[in-house]
Amino acid sequence: MDAGKIKSALADVTAEQDPTIKSLKMASLCSALWAERGVELVVVGGSAIEILTEGAYASGDLDMCHATRETLPVAERKEIMGLLDAKGGLRNWKVVGMYLDLLGPVESFAHTPFRRIEAPYGNILLMKPEDLLVERVLMTFYLGESQTARDCAKKLVAVILGGDMAVNWDEVRRVANLPEYRNLPECIKLVKEVADELKVKSPLHPD
């Protein structure tokens, strides 16, 4: 991507008033620049949930990991982020007023593919909702109950149960039963809670 296109894209991101679309555009721009160097990025955590739920949950920043095995050398990372006039360090950056965290390799346990969606400057990858759901439920109950994580998990489940996002529930069960999580009962409980609120059947509830 040449300097003129980058400048135009940054102006577009700066002018965007919708925070979710702003994150989407920034993720698209950053992904395009890293892809030119052979590294595929994926939006993770609350940032992925914000985009998947179309803003029902607002994360307030943008978190990305690399989906390819290798990341870029320090000098090359600085060079790319310099093209965006980013301020900060190797992981934590500020670009046109947005906080962008470029983390390490993505950690995924689900056997489903990353979600790929169209975006203004090229497609972006989003973390698998099966992973996101189990992870957020873990955060809800880890070291006491986190209301923020709980609200986030419920909004994700509501979008899924509303039919706007397909999820492999067998994978949710399998991931939740892994030693890294072991929180299937908590997942079943939270999904049923949202299902009851929506007056639909919980796909995790045993018949």
Regions found by a protein language model. Name each.
Residues 1-207:
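Compositionally biased terminal segments of proteins
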